[in-house]
C-alpha cells in the first residue's frame, strides 16, 4: 500500500466548482484522485520543461489580470532583463480585466526556462504556457 499524506488547500469557489464539474465529467471516484492526477500531470510537465537543453525557439504565452498591482510593469522589466532572448512580443486585450502576451523567444533552453519561471511566479499572472521547438538546422533527420 502506498503511504498517503493528508493535506488541506484553499481554493476560490469558482475554481473548485469548475474542477468538480471535470471530476464528475471524467468519472473520478473522488476529488483526491483527480487532484493526484493533476499533480502528476504538473510534475511531468515540470520535468519535461526542465530537461530541455541546447538552442531552442518558441513562445511563452501569458494571461494576466492587468488590474493586479504592478503586474504589467513587472512583466515588462523581466522581459527587458532577457532582451537577448526575446525576438518579439504580441499584446492582446482579452476582456476588461485580462490581457494576453505572447513572447517569441530564441536562445539557450536554460535561459528560456529561467525567463518562463520568472514570468510564471508574478502575482496577477493567471496562466503561462511555454512551447519550444528545435530551430531549423538542428532538427534530427
Swiss-Prot record:
Ni(2+) binds at residues 80, 91, 93, 99. GO terms for biological process: response to nickel cation. Gene3D superfamilies: ACT-like. Chain A, domain 2 (3.30.70.1150), Met repressor-like (1.10.1220.10). Keywords: DNA-binding, Metal-binding, Nickel, Transcription, Transcription regulation. CDD domains: RHH_NikR_HicB-like. The keyword Nucleotide-binding does not apply. Binds 1 nickel ion per subunit. Pfam families: NikR_C, RHH_1. The keyword Coiled coil does not apply. Its cofactor is Ni(2+). InterPro entries: Acetolactate_synth/TF_NikR_C, ACT-like_dom_sf, Arc_rbn_hlx_hlx, CopG, CopG/NikR_regulator, Ni_resp_reg_NikR, Ribbon_hlx_hlx, TF_NikR_Ni-bd_C. Belongs to the transcriptional regulatory CopG/NikR family. NCBIfam families: PRK00630.1, PRK01002.1, PRK02967.1, PRK04460.1. Transcriptional regulator. This is Putative nickel-responsive regulator.
Amino acid at each position: 500500500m502506498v503511504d498517503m499524506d493528508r493535506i488541506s488547500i484553499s481554493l476560490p469557489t469558482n475554481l473548485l466548482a469548475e474542477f468538480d464539474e471535470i471530476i464528475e465529467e471524467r468519472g473520478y471516484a473522488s476529488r483526491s484522485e483527480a487532484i493526484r492526477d493533476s499533480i502528476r500531470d504538473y510534475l511531468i510537465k515540470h520535468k519535461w520543461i526542465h530537461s530541455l537543453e541546447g538552442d531552442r525557439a518558441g513562445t511563452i504565452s501569458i494571461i494576466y489580470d492587468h488590474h493586479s498591482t504592478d503586474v504589467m510593469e513587472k512583466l515588462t522589466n523581466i522581459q527587458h532583463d532577457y532582451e537577448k532572448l526575446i525576438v518579439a512580443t504580441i499584446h492582446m486585450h482579452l476582456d476588461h480585466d485580462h490581457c494576453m502576451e505572447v513572447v517569441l523567444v530564441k536562445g539557450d533552453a536554460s535561459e528560456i526556462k529561467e525567463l518562463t519561471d520568472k514570468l510564471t511566479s508574478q502575482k496577477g499572472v493567471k496562466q503561462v504556457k511555454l512551447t519550444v521547438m528545435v530551430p531549423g538546422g538542428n532538427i534530427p533527420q
